[in-house]
Amino acid sequence: MTMRSKTFSDRILNDSEFFKWCQKEESRNADSITLYKSILEFESKFKSGSPSLSLLKLARHIHRKYVSLNTGTCNVIEDSTRTEMSKRVHEVLDGKSPYIELFDPLKQPLFQHLRSMHTEYSTTTADVSNTWEDTSSTDSSDKGATIWFNDDAIDRSSRHEISQNTVTHESEDDRFAFFNAVCTRLNSLQETKNSSETEEEKKKERSADPYGSDGFAPPPQSTQTHTLRNLPKRFESLYKKKRQQNTTTTDSSGFGSNASDFWSFERYGKSNHGTLERPNRLFPGSNNGFSTLQPKKRSGEIQKLTVELRYENDVPMVAKISANQSVTLRYFRHLFGLHYSDNCRFFFKSTCEDGSAHYQWTLLFQDDDILPVFQNRITAICRMCPPPPEDHHLI
């Protein structure tokens, strides 16, 4: 790959807007960007002298998530290339030393796909800056067109036309014709701009401004309270009684001046204006229609068993399965998608047989072996091992 192509690929991979644009449609396959980054990460780790285990994990991840015909998501690569890559990765996982050219067959088709997608993205984003933009309002009489004056777009179009129709201006007539053409173009653009400004001013004049033309807001709407309607039923009889007695408010200027509390009912009604009437909360035995229902435990709920797999120095992978079944090593491999020829050993946590420790790690390698359950869960750890001799196949 040339220096120019390398710079172009770096610009594509680091363009966050381009990545978001690819995610909008499945056909653009945004995973191709992530795959290309992962390949560069693999090569960088190889050059820096990372351990073989780290390279194997990364190669396994790239193959399973993007390249594999069964589980891969990067479908822009031809099936023949993906099959070749699967063969390469399996050879490395079976004991062959990792090498920096492992993913070279993927780089060229990925680069071509990213270049074509970025060309389409550049064209699309350039077309978004349209010179004309139609706008409409709620009222049919207020509909109009808003003109957006884009100097950059006009400048690009002018340069394009000039490059197609090159005028040498050698004679006086050619220069005069060019002068008239420029004046005609400028006058047309000026009229377009003036028309746009006129339409904008008309829209502002017709717009429904809540503050009016003089900048003052209209007075707020009156809030009329209906005290008797909003008053709870337990206060209704007491309210009517006080209204019939024509109670007058007394002087309340002093502290504890025996002021009438008749105003409190008015305030109570006003504060509850426009709110939902809630039932009496003084009686806990009443049925509240607005209360949150307490969750009821279903009697037929199926119990789950947690199955955990952890690679060395890696985060655990967890699965939930039905607890009413016996789990074999074959089902365990199928559950986590583990390849049959992987050079790894699975150790399962179980109760210590001699009682010298709280638990022990038991090695299981037969597909029909039943996995031990320790503390209501199955816990496994995977360790990478060198390939066994040809006359001993444990897995």
From Swiss-Prot:
Question: Taking every annotated instance into account, which residue ranges of this chain make up the domain DIX?
Answer: 301-386
Q: Which GO terms describe its biological process?
A: axon guidance; cell development; negative regulation of Wnt signaling pathway; Wnt signaling pathway
One Pfam family for this entry, by name?
Answer: DIX
What molecular functions are annotated in GO for this chain? protein kinase binding
User: Residues annotated as region Disordered?
Assistant: 190-230
> Matching SUPFAM superfamilies, A to Z?
Regulator of G-protein signaling, RGS, Ubiquitin-like
Q: Does the keyword Membrane apply?
A: no
Give the highest taxon in the source lineage.
Answer: Eukaryota
Keywords associated with the record: Developmental protein, Wnt signaling pathway
Q: Where is the composition biased (Basic and acidic residues)?
A: 194-208
Segments forming domain RGS: 4-132
Q: What does this protein do?
A: Works in parallel with pry-1 in negatively regulating bar-1 signaling in vulval precursor cells and Q neuroblasts. Shown to have a role in excretory cell development.
Q: How does it assemble?
A: Interacts with bar-1, dsh-2, gsk-3, and mig-5.
- The molecule here is called Axin-like protein 1
Q: Which organism is it from?
A: Caenorhabditis briggsae
Taxonomic classification = Eukaryota, Metazoa, Ecdysozoa, Nematoda, Chromadorea
